[in-house]
A protein has these predicted regions:
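Beta-strand-centric surfaces of beta-sandwich/beta-rich domains
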Residues: 1-225
Length: 225
């Protein structure tokens, strides 16, 4: 896989900006560190600005991008909006303010412009951020599974309610559902999150969801190819 120059900017509650930049291989989740032009040395954000409170951010790649997040003590602590360069018109607010801790990192998955990786990024009323992913190879129903555990959404978020979310996929007209559906144990749709192509429309968190999640629920979408 080729490398690409990934850039970003994080905004803190006190007005501090944290510029990010790194050469990252497409198709491999990697650390995104601070931009050495402005921060002298490349550092992970938790070591560069411990105690600062993130309130907004955007991360952009050359050809394709699936997701970005703050990794803290092994968990997804905060999800950062993503896009291909030249698409985003703003630095979006995060779902909730997040105070950086020493050791925190930005993790990002960049892609080629033809990679079909899909992601569903959600935030719950209980304050939990999670990412669900899939890599389809053809037609059929594709389940999105937890990035860190490989579990279904019902196992990961049992008893919680999704209140914010966005989805990412380049598949466009190949998708025959209204984005990613959350379905209950009987297959009934209890919520839907659009899947946007980050090369054409920067995915941003919608604030209008009220999607309950229980055991045996799934996140999935249907493809015609």
């Amino acid at each position: 896989m080729a490398t690409n120059t990934v850039v970003g900017n994080l905004v803190c509650s006190d007005g501090t900006n944290i510029p990010l930049k790194a050469e990252i291989a497409e198709g491999t989740e990697s650390d995104l560190t601070t931009d050495t032009v402005y921060t002298v040395s490349a550092q992970n954000i938790g070591d560069y600005a411990p105690g600062k409170v993130l309130v907004a951010g955007s991360i952009q790649a050359d050809n394709g991008i699936s997701y970005a997040y703050v990794l803290s003590q092994g968990l997804v602590a905060s999800i950062i909006p993503v896009s291909v360069k030249g698409v985003s018109q703003e630095v979006p607010m995060l779902c909730a303010p997040y105070q950086l801790k020493a050791g925190d990192k930005i993790r990002v998955l960049t892609l080629t412009n033809s990679a079909r990786n899909a992601s569903l990024c959600v935030y719950t009323a209980q304050g939990v951020s999670r990412i669900f992913v899939a890599t389809p190879t053809g037609a059929g129903t594709e389940q999105l599974l937890d990035l860190q555990t490989g579990n279904a959404i019902g196992d990961t978020l049992q008893g919680q309610t999704i209140v914010k979310g966005f989805g990412s996929s380049i598949d466009g007209s190949k998708i025959e559902t209204m984005g990613a559906y959350v379905v209950d144990a009987l297959g009934n749709v209890v919520g839907a999150v659009p899947l946007s192509d980050p090369a054409n429309n920067a995915p941003i968190f919608s604030m209008s969801y009220n999607i309950p999640v229980a055991l045996n629920f799934k996140a999935q979408y249907l493809l015609n190819a």
